[in-house]
Amino acid sequence: ALHFTEDIRTLELSPLVEHVLKTRVLYPDAFVVLWASLECTNFSKAKGGQPRDADSRTLAEHLFRYIESINPDYIQIENVEEFMSWGPMNEEGKPLSTRKGEDYTRWVSKVKSHGYNFDYRILNAADYGAYTSRKRFFGIFAKNGLPVIFPEPTHCKEGKRDLFDDLARWKPVKDVLDLEDEGTSIFTRKKTLSEKTLERIYAGLIKFVAGGKEKWLLKYNSIN
C-alpha cells in the first residue's frame, strides 16, 4: 500500500501511477476506485452566513489530473448535501444565490466527458445502522458499461416490517451514551471558552434542557 501526506493539489503523481499500473497487471479483474471525501467546511450550511474559502471550494477541480493519470473504473464522492449548490461567489466570499449549483453541474458534466455515467443519492447514516441521523451526498461515476449501485437501507425511523420491507428501527443514541461520564466542567477550565462556543452551549441548553427534567428524560428515552 502507498500512503501520502502531501497536499492533493501538488502531489507528484508518478509513484501513484506506477503503483496503479502494477496493480492492474497483478489483478486484471480488479476495479480501480478513486474515492474523494472533499473538504466540506466551505460548502456546509453549518458555516452560516460567514464568507467561504474560494480555494477550498475548488478542491473538486483537482480530481481531474488524478482521473487523467490513473483512469479509475469508479469515482466515488462523499460530501455534505450543499455540495450540489456549489456555484460562484461574490466579492465578499458569499455564494451567489442566483447561480447556485452552476459549478456543480459544470463539474459533473466535465467528469462524465471522460467516459463515465453518473448517479447520486442523499443517504442518511441512521438508515444504515449508525447511532446518528446525518445526511450526506454520495455520488458515483462509473465507466460506461459498469453498474452504479447504492446500498439498500437496513433501518428506518419507525421501523417497517411487511411483505416488501424488513427494516429495523433507528438505533437510539442512548445505547452508546455513558451518562456516568460527566466530562470536565466548563467553569473549571484553565482557558476560558470563546464567546462563540459559549453561545452554542447556551443555545443547546435552551433547546434541550430548559424544558425541565421530565422533558429531557422523554428526549433521552426516545429516538427523536
Can you describe what each PLM-predicted range is?
Residues L13-V33, C40-N224:
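Class I S-adenosyl-L-methionine
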